[in-house]
Amino acid sequence: VAVSADPNEPNVIVTRLTLVCSTAPGPLELDLTGDLESFKIKISFRYIQHTYRKGVKIDKTDYMVGSYGPRAEEYEFLTPMEEAPKGMLARFTDDDKTDHLSGERNLTIKK
């Protein structure tokens, strides 16, 4: 990624979003440098994840990603590993024996 010293350029340029799951075949990587018409992404320096069970919020995880000074190399932030909820209602295979964990992923990033 080329680094620009133009004062008219934005201070922060987000070039990539990568989602990592230890049981997935590989990371899901979104290139944010090309045509972004199909993406609706809001970038902030805070990562918040809500966990719901039967429509009720049971957990909220909040990470401060940080503040970074300018440099030529890209910065990388990796959140700590998280464990999915356990129990009868928290499963990846439903009553019809459909395995949701190994299927195609859908990602919704919204406010």
From Swiss-Prot:
The modification N6-succinyllysine is found at K60. Keywords: Acetylation, Cytoplasm, GTPase activation, Isopeptide bond, Ubl conjugation. There is a cross-link at K57, K60 (Glycyl lysine isopeptide (Lys-Gly) (interchain with G-Cter in SUMO1)). Gene3D superfamilies: Coagulation Factor XIII, subunit A, domain 1. The N-terminus is blocked. One of its GO terms (biological process) is Rho protein signal transduction. The keyword Ubl conjugation applies. Monomer. Interacts with FER. Interacts with PLXNB3. Forms a heterodimer with RAC1. Interacts with RHOA, the affinity is increased by three orders of magnitude when RHOA is prenylated. Interacts with PSMD10; the interaction increases ARHGDIA association with RHOA, leading to ARHGDIA-mediated inactivation of RHOA and ROCK and prolonged AKT activation. Interacts with KANK2; the interaction is direct and may regulate the interaction of ARHGDIA with RHOA, RAC1 and CDC42. Interacts with RHOC. Interacts with CDC42. Interacts with NGFR (via death domain); NGFR binding decreases the affinity for RHOA. Belongs to the Rho GDI family. Controls Rho proteins homeostasis. Regulates the GDP/GTP exchange reaction of the Rho proteins by inhibiting the dissociation of GDP from them, and the subsequent binding of GTP to them. Retains Rho proteins such as CDC42, RAC1 and RHOA in an inactive cytosolic pool, regulating their stability and protecting them from degradation. Actively involved in the recycling and distribution of activated Rho GTPases in the cell, mediates extraction from membranes of both inactive and activated molecules due its exceptionally high affinity for prenylated forms. This is Rho GDP-dissociation inhibitor 1. The lineage of its organism: Eukaryota, Metazoa, Chordata, Craniata, Vertebrata. The gene is ARHGDIA.
